[in-house]
Regions:
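Glycine-rich beta-strand-to-loop/alpha-helix junction loops that act as flexible
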Residues: 92-93, 207-212
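ATP-binding N-lobe of GHMP and related small-molecule kinases
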Residues: 1-88, 106, 133, 151
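Short, active-site-adjacent cap segments at secondary-structure transitions
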Residues: 85-87, 120, 212-215
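DPxDG-like acidic metal-binding loop motif
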Residues: 88-109, 113
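Short, hydrophobic beta-strand segments that form beta-sheet elements in well-ordered domains
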Residues: 65-68, 101, 187, 214-218
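ATP-dependent small-molecule kinase catalytic core of the GHMP/sugar-kinase superfamily
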Residues: 2, 10-26, 107-205, 217-240
């Protein structure tokens, strides 16, 4: 099974629920970078991870795939080839979980949010406006776009970014992403990476959701000497 990466093109925080969960209004798209999964029924769940981005991906119960299988009441052996960079905000874990739900023919998009906030979008895929805490998916017409991804060597905690957003009083982001000022506050080194990326490509870089991935529209020419340590990935949007 193919599990495409997702990219958050824009994100507005529209409120905070009484339980502390943040409400969003975001545009998300699927990319042509994808993990590959082989899933077979088994008496207990096991996960094997290989591929260029396998390092750091857990194979125990902390892997979100376990939660997806528990939701649909199944156990399986899951072999994952990780082609999506880990920890950069591209939905690598969520899309693997969504692939498992598709394999199990689980179609309750709202319930899939109990596995993870990005799982509902990954279950639907394509291009969509995503609202609520991620469980409301409003499909949008597909738009073909070429995108250059810049993945710095830093892991960003999404909860930490939302906590920073709260502490800052709920700032609005100038670039269509309300989490960008919060991410830059929580992880000041992200600003240096943004500056280096914009210098290298001579155009604006946008933060993907809470980060740490930055992106630029188009397949950009760049001065790679300015981007030591940054993974540069050329991607395109894909239909669901």
């Amino acid at each position: 099974m193919i599990a495409p990466a997702k990219l958050t093109l824009s994100l507005r925080v529209t409120g905070v629920r009484a339980d502390g969960f943040h409400l969003i209004d975001a545009e998300m798209v699927s990319l042509d970078i994808a993990d590959e999964l082989i899933i077979t029924d088994a008496t207990s769940t096991t996960i094997v991870v290989t591929g260029p981005y396998a390092d750091g991906v857990p194979t125990d119960e902390t892997n979100i795939v376990h939660k997806a299988l528990a939701l649909c009441g199944r156990t399986a052996h899951v072999s994952i080839v990780k082609n999506i960079p880990h920890g950069g905000g591209l939905g690598g874990g969520s899309t693997d979980a969504a692939a498992v739900l598709r394999w199990a023919q689980f179609t309750d998009v709202g319930a899939s949010a109990t596995v993870g906030a990005d799982v509902p979008f990954c279950l639907v895929g394509g291009r969509a406006q995503v609202k609520g805490i991620g469980e409301i998916i409003e499909p949008l017409p597909f738009e073909e776009k070429k995108i250059t991804l810049f993945i710095p060597p830093i892991h960003v905690s999404t909860p930490a970014v939302y906590q920073a957003w709260d502490r800052l009083g709920g700032p609005k982001g100038d670039n269509g992403n309300d989490l960008e000022p919060a991410a830059l506050h929580a992880y000041p080194e992200l600003q240096a990476w943004k500056n280096s990326i914009e210098d290298a490509v001579q155009q604006k870089a946008f933060l993907a959701g809470s980060g740490a991935t930055w992106f630029a529209l188009g397949h950009t020419q760049l001065d790679s000497a300015r981007l030591a340590g940054v993974q540069v990935v050329y991607a395109s949007t894909r239909p669901g």
